[in-house]
């Protein structure tokens, strides 16, 4: 049987209409699964004649090229690398209209092309890991927030609460408990898949952090093990350890697959990978992950707990978004959830988006009534209030540079306020790992003094960022700036 080679992948790409025609490239055990922009561009007869191609299946929106066991994953990895590593020279269309969507997309893509460093590519994979989970984070957080509101208004202090309401509150809270009880497994699956391994192997490795190793424990699922060949097991590190195990596990799996005969790949590759990575996880990753987890928690709790550190974090967050490395904060969110019971970093970083809103409003006020800038701001300001900041960043402030800087100043002012309140003894945070960053986040806020105090502090921080971003832009962000 023909081996998967670079020339073979290039032949397939040419036959399916080029890289520009590929939306998504994935695989199952035997098939290269492609989602194409236009199936009509694919030359089916040519594909079938390529050496190593065993067949072609078209199902729903997928174009499936049968390559056989042990080959499909290699082909998918090579094709993805080929598509990422080279620029697509296909002709691009240019629209005459310069609405917000066009401008934002253009500037965003220019920046993305510059993000080629290994560190940026590594951090960008965090989006692949966590983005599919965000709807669940938000849903569970909103349900928990509304349940907590009902609890504080109708249940606490009530000697005879309504039984149905109590059941409803417990029902609304159970989703959050379920999510966080087994979240590590979901992350392990996504992480190993994002780095080129099999998701199920990552999920199994992540489950080692969820299982219990104390037979006398009254909660959790006992693993049946108390030690690993005499080496004590301490499943610390949680999400940090899971990420390390899944990333290394993906590398081990790919290396094992290189030496595994094709006909044994489906049976033995995962077996060998799990045996190797299980031992590495118990002996090395769990202890290291625990130290990193504790260190990360300590560092950001101290940064969050003082106004200067919070101002710096909020002020620089938009720059991290611009370079695509903001997903690197997500493991910190987990560390803070574990240490504090809520995500105290998220509301600080959310001030950055509020600063953008204030800056955009100042630009709107300064621009002429018939200016295109006003149209762009109108199209992006409502999403900005709701915590969706990319249209403002890439379409309004960043192309004009100065307003982007003054927006960062506005975010820093709000971050300073949140940090000051925390320094005075009232840290606030999100009740879930991740959520919306605008006014929609209000029901998800909590604090040591309860949900109402958390909501009030967050709302005040938003207002401060709006005002500071507006004033900084009004006085310092519009001189020699295109307001047309």
From Swiss-Prot:
One GO cellular component term of this record is: plasma membrane
The active site annotation covers: 28 (phosphocysteine intermediate)
Q: Residue ranges under compositional bias (Basic and acidic residues)?
A: 96-106
Name this polypeptide is given: PTS system N-acetylmuramic acid-specific EIIBC component
UniProt membrane topology term: Multi-pass membrane protein
EC number, as in UniProt: 2.7.1.192
Keywords of this entry: Cell inner membrane, Cell membrane, Kinase, Membrane, Phosphotransferase system, Sugar transport, Transferase, Transmembrane, Transmembrane helix, Transport
Enumerate the transmembrane spans: 126-146, 168-188, 194-214, 232-252, 273-293, 312-332, 345-365, 379-399, 404-424, 451-471
Judging by the UniProt lineage, the source's domain of life is Bacteria
Pfam families registered for this protein in UniProt: PTS_EIIB (PF00367), PTS_EIIC (PF02378)
Point out the gene that encodes the protein.
Answer: murP
Molecular function, one GO term: protein-phosphocysteine-N-acetylmuramate phosphotransferase system transporter activity
- Return the annotated region ranges for Disordered: 83-106
Cited function: The phosphoenolpyruvate-dependent sugar phosphotransferase system (sugar PTS), a major carbohydrate active transport system, catalyzes the phosphorylation of incoming sugar substrates concomitantly with their translocation across the cell membrane. This system is involved in N-acetylmuramic acid (MurNAc) transport, yielding cytoplasmic MurNAc-6-P. Is also able to take up anhydro-N-acetylmuramic acid (anhMurNAc), but cannot phosphorylate the carbon 6, probably because of the 1,6-anhydro ring.
């Amino acid at each position: 049987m023909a081996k998967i080679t670079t020339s073979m992948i290039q032949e397939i790409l040419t036959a399916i209409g080029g890289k520009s025609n590929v939306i998504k490239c994935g695989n199952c055990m035997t098939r290269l699964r492609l989602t194409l922009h236009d199936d009509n561009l694919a030359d089916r007869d040519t594909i079938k004649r390529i050496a190593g191609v065993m067949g072609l299946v078209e199902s729903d929106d997928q174009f499936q090229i049968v390559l056989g066991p042990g080959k499909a994953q290699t082909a998918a990895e090579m094709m993805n690398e080929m598509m990422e590593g080279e620029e697509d020279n296909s002709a691009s269309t240019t629209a005459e209209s310069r609405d917000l969507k066009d401008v934002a997309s253009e500037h965003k893509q220019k920046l993305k092309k510059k993000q080629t460093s290994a560190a940026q590519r590594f951090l960008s994979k965090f989006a692949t890991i966590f983005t599919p989970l965000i709807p669940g984070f938000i849903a569970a957080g909103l349900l928990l927030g509304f349940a907590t509101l009902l609890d504080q208004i109708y249940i606490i202090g009530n000697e005879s609460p309504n039984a149905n309401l109590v059941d409803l509150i417990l029902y609304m809270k159970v989703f959050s408990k379920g999510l966080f009880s087994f979240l590590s497994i979901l992350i392990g699956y996504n992480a190993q898949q994002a780095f080129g391994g099999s998701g199920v192997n990552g999920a199994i490795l992540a489950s080692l952090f969820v299982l219990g190793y104390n037979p006398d424990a009254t909660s959790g699922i006992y693993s049946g093990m108390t030690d690993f060949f005499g080496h004590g097991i301490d499943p610390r590190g949680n999400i940090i350890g899971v990420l390390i195990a899944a990333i290394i596990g993906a590398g081990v799996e790919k290396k094992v697959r290189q030496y595994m005969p094709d006909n044994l790949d489906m049976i033995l590759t995962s077996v060998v990978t799990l045996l190797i990575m299980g031992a590495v996880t118990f002996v090395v990753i769990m202890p290291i992950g625990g130290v990193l987890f504790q260190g990360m928690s300590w560092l950001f709790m101290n940064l969050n707990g003082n106004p200067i550190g919070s101002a710096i974090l909020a002020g620089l967050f938009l720059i991290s978004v611009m370079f695509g490395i903001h997903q690197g904060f997500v493991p910190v969110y987990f560390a803070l959830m574990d240490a504090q019971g809520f995500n105290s970093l998220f509301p600080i970083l959310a001030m950055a988006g509020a600063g953008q809103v204030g800056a955009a409003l100042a630009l709107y006020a300064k621009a002429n009534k018939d200016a295109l800038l006003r149209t762009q701001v109108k199209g992006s300001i409502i999403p900005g209030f709701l915590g969706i900041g990319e249209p403002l960043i890439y379409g309004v402030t960043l192309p004009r540079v100065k307003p982007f800087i003054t927006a960062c100043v506005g975010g820093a002012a709000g971050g300073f306020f949140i940090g000051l309140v925390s320094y005075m003894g009232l840290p606030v945070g999100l009740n879930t790992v991740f959520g919306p960053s605008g006014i929609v986040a209000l029901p998800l806020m909590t604090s040591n003094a309860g949900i109402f105090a958390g909501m009030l502090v967050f709302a005040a921080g938003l207002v401060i960022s709006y005002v500071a971003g507006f004033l900084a832009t009004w006085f310092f962000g519009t001189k020699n700036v295109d307001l047309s």
